[in-house]
Amino acid sequence: MEAERRRQAEKPKKGRVGSNLLPERHPATGTPTTTVDSSAPPCRRLPGAGGGRSRFSPQGGQRGRPHSRRRHRTTFSPVQLEQLESAFGRNQYPDIWARESLARDTGLSEARIQVWFQNRRAKQRKQERSLLQPLAHLSPAAFSSFLPESTACPYSYAAPPPPVTCFPHPYSHALPSQPSTGGAFALSHQSEDWYPTLHPAPAGHLPCPPPPPMLPLSLEPSKSWN
């Protein structure tokens, strides 16, 4: 008898252990309800699960990635900017002694002055490129219109020079007349070759004077001394 009582007492315990796995229906409403056995042992955590540290810090940032350093921005007073600009106008590439002298005058460090000169040179190059960019689309004829007119012809004259008049040679009257007409014709033809007809030169150019004519050497010594 005692053995049967023990078996009946153990039967509901076995049902209670499996009741946390399958839902039971409520007797009044018929809706499924789940009963949790408080006597069940708690779940064990595996030794390798969740053992690593969290990547995120309590402040919300990641531990593995360092924070970026914030740059210290230097502000210049109007007096300092004026001194730096005047020094930049004199020399765009100052040496170490010039930078140290400028640092004493402005109260800034030599490294700050060196960085300012680097930024100022980069700014000037950017301004020059922005000025030359519109001129790159112009044609050569349009670009020549920007040049002054005086550079087009540096050797031009304001007014044309007066025409040069031909004077007779001083030895033409002293020479005796030749009896033969062939010699006179040759002499006149020679003078025409050496003295071409003078035309008015174009404006801005001086005419080149012709060389002097050759004197005839067919004169007799007695007549030339008389």
UniProtKB/Swiss-Prot annotation:
Expressed specifically in embryonic pituitary. Residues 1-75, 196-226 are annotated as: Disordered. Changing F88S: In CPHD2; impairs binding of the mutated protein to DNA target sequences. Residues 1-12 have a biased composition (Basic and acidic residues). One of its GO terms (molecular function) is RNA polymerase II cis-regulatory region sequence-specific DNA binding. GO terms for biological process: apoptotic process; blood vessel development; cell migration; central nervous system development; dorsal/ventral pattern formation; hypophysis morphogenesis; hypothalamus cell differentiation; negative regulation of apoptotic process. Residues 216-226 have a biased composition (Low complexity). Residues 69-128 bind DNA. It is found in: Nucleus. It comes from the Eukaryota. GO terms for cellular component: chromatin; nucleus; transcription regulator complex. Keywords: Disease variant, DNA-binding, Dwarfism, Homeobox, Nucleus. Residues 64-74 have a biased composition (Basic residues). Changing F117I: In CPHD2; familial. It holds the Pfam family Homeodomain. Possibly involved in the ontogenesis of pituitary gonadotropes, as well as somatotropes, lactotropes and caudomedial thyrotropes. It is linked to Pituitary hormone deficiency, combined, 2: Combined pituitary hormone deficiency is defined as the impaired production of growth hormone and one or more of the other five anterior pituitary hormones. CPHD2 is characterized by pleiotropic deficiencies of growth hormone, thyroid-stimulating hormone, follicle-stimulating hormone, luteinizing hormone, prolactin and adrenocorticotropic hormone. This is Homeobox protein prophet of Pit-1. It comes from Homo sapiens.
